[in-house]
Amino acid sequence: MMRRLMTIVIMLLMLSSCYYFNQVVDDIRDSNAVERGRKKDGGGAYKNDKYKEGVYKAIDDIAKRPVNKKVQFEGTELIIPENTVINNDTWTLLDLKTGYGLPIGFSNEGECLKKTIKGKVYGLSYNDYISGVKEIGKKIEKANGFIYTCK
């Protein structure tokens, strides 16, 4: 009887420990996404001391460029600054001249800045506390017709 009781207790412990295993796996995925964003071509490159100065120079340069390059993003056409692309891995703006990622992101979900085309919602987000990024973001917002929906 005692042996069966111990077996049941151990089985219950094993079943309940799956939750903690899943939490660890989710935490690893989240930390990988954060690290990927802080690489040179990610949107969080400005947070990395190694790239910070170069990213700010790239932002100043891109702010002076016209917003006239048409690119495909998740089935729609967007207009972005020339000599930039949307990074396929992080969905952030990437400067082709320097290779630095900018804190300007695109998504296929609704953000505060969104645009609906044929029933699909596209979002734009940018760090408006960094000098130059707000300028670039406003230009992209205006060129593509994104609408601010948050209050």
Question: What is each PLM-predicted segment?
Answer:
Residues 95-110:
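Short, surface-exposed polybasic-and-hydrophobic patches located at secondary-structure transitions
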Residues 19-99, 125-151:
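N-terminal targeting sequences that direct proteins away from the cytosol to non-cytosolic compartments
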Residues 92, 108-118:
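Short, surface-exposed beta-strand/loop micro-motifs that present aromatic residues
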Residues 120-122:
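Short hydrophobic/glycine-rich mini-motifs in sensory/regulatory modules
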Residues 1-20:
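Sec-dependent bacterial lipoprotein signal peptides
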